[in-house]
Amino acid sequence: MNERDLENYNFIRAGGIGFIEQKRGLIEVSGKEAVQFLNGLITNDVAKLEESERMYAAFPNAQGRLLAVIRVMRRNDKFLFETEAATHEKVYQNLFRFTFAGDFFVEDLTEKYGYFSIANYKLQITNSDSIEFDSRFGRDRFVPKEAAEEFLNELKNQAAVEISGELYEVLRIEQGIPLYAVDMDETTIVPELGIENLISYNKGCYIGQEIIARIYFRGHIAKQLTGLIFENEAAPVNPDDEIKSTEGKNAGRITSVTFSPKLEKTIALAFVRYDYLAEDTALKIGDLTAKVKNLPFIV
């Protein structure tokens, strides 16, 4: 991390506002049969969403494996789906193919909005046309492109600092936010993410529901995404490094790694086998020792 990033990091961790402009997908779903179709596709129950409420959900395939993690918002009797750039097209196609089956309409709004991830919950900018989602990071905003410049000026008026890609990666890992194609992909079974309130176990059937419900009601996940804190300040570890128990048994693999200035330790996101998930469990990565830490690293 360079000197400028470290200054901005300390500013944000002290309560200042930081922002980064990113590419994310935004898709609108409407129609009289929208709830019926959506509840057959995703893990959470959109029927429970009141106006302006939001929830996390996932698109699984028939084997319960992950296609995408999304955030859903109900707005004016329509549903807004927010997704990573890496899964945007996949989510859109999964929704669009059902538009021929009933009163169900899908519109891709991505090119109409700019997206800003805000590292702070106290930002006060009123814009009735913007769309806001909460995250572990702070508050994320979709802003109409014609209003983006004004929004940036408002951020600067509130002394917000711009977050570089490298700094965002540090903050992302500290907050335990998984990234598609890095920390999760189509080999991931949805419950392995360990994201709270991602799945409804009380609603009706949906694609992949049988596998996901069986894991919940009859057993437990084989592994789960969690955190690791290394004893060494600057531990030489990398994504895909194997994790072993202190007895030398395979215990998982690392997915993302960074150095946390606040914790003054190397930290990582990792899939860890069920038997070793308890917080503070000691694990080995080569000659290095790390302890399991429940996410996020920093509250």
Regions found by a protein language model. Name each.
Residues I20-L41, E107-N120, H220-E231:
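Short glycine-/aliphatic-rich beta-strand segments at the starts of folded cytosolic domains
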Residues E33-L38, H88-Y92, Y121, E146-N153, ...:
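Short, conserved charged micro-motifs
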Residues N39-A47, Q93-A101, N153, N157, ...:
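Short, intrinsically disordered, mixed-charge
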Residues F142-I229:
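Anionic-ligand-binding alpha/beta catalytic cores of soluble enzymes and soluble regulatory domains
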Residues F59, I118-N127, P236-K249:
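Short amphipathic alpha-helix segments
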Residues R65, L171, L193-I199, Y206-Q209, ...:
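Glycine-rich, small/acidic residue-mixed loop/short-helix segments
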Residues M1-A68, M73:
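Acidic, proline/glycine-enriched N-terminal capping motif
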Residues I17-E21, G25-L26, R71-P178:
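Acidic, low-complexity central loop/insert segments
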